[in-house]
Amino acid sequence: RVDPELGFLKPTDDYPILTPTGNESFAGLTHAPLFNVAKLTWRTETLGIRDLMKVNVPAALAMLRFDFGATYAAFDQVTAGAYLDALNFPPLARQRLLHVFAHSCFNPQADMSAADLLQMLHFYFTANHDGLVFDVADRPFSRGIFQPLGVLLERLGAGIRMGVSARALERRDGDRWVVETDQEPLTADLVVLATEVPGVKAIVGASRGLDDADWRRQVDSLRVTNAFAVWRLWLDRPVARGRAGFAGTAGVGPLDNISVYENLEDESRAWATRTGGSVVELHAYALPA
C-alpha cells in the first residue's frame, strides 16, 4: 500500500437515499453481516409484515447465499431486471433499497447479469464489515493515491510512461512480447491489457501473434455500456447545512447521486471557504443510448 495506515480515508456519517416520497438512511446499522440486513428490513418504512410475506423467499435468499460458481451457474443468463422483478418487493422498497445499487453498476438492468448484481449486493450487504456507510478520500485521488503510487513504483524500479499510446503487441522469440507504441517499442516478459473496451479491441485487432481465435472472438464481442454523466458545479453560494457529502437518489429522473465535495475533500473545502460557494457534483448512471 502507498499508505499502509490509509490516512487519506475518512469515515462518512451516512449514505442516505433521497427520493420524492421519503428518504432511506444506512447510518446506525450493525456491521455484522445478516444482522445489518435484518435491522435495515425491520426499520425501513417501505417493507411491512404483509409485504415481507409476499417476497419471493428463494430469490431473496440468493442474495445471502452468494457462491461464485453456483450463483453464476444459476443466474448469469438471467437479467438483473428479471431477478428484481422476481423478488416481488413493493415498488418503494425496490426503488430505495435495490434500484440505487443496481443502477450504480453503470449497466441497464435489462442487460446486466443477475449474477453480477448478486455479487455486488453480497459485497455491500453481507460481505463488507464496514457495511453501507463507507470511507471516502479526504483529498483528490491524484494526491491521495496516484502520485504516491507513482513514487513508490519508481522507488521499486518500475518505469512509468505518461502520455504514451500502446498500439499493438507482437510475440517474439517464443516468450517475449514487444509493445508497439507511438514512441519507442517496449519489450516485456508479460503484458496486462488494462484499458477501456475500444482500446483493448483496437490493440488486439492490430496485434500479431495472438493466435487464440476464441479469445479474439470474446474480445470482439465486448460492448461498451451506457454512458455515465458527471456534472460538477462551482456554486456562488453554499448548499444547506447538514447536506450529506454523498447521497444516492431515486425517482428523480436520470439523477442518481448528489455529492457535496467540500464535505468530502480538502481541495474543494478550501475553495468553498475562500469563495463562500459550494462544489456540487451530480451523477447519472447508465444513461439511455
Which residues make up each language-model segment?
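Amphipathic alpha-helical segments that form well-ordered structural scaffolds
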Residues: 1, 79, 83, 101, ...
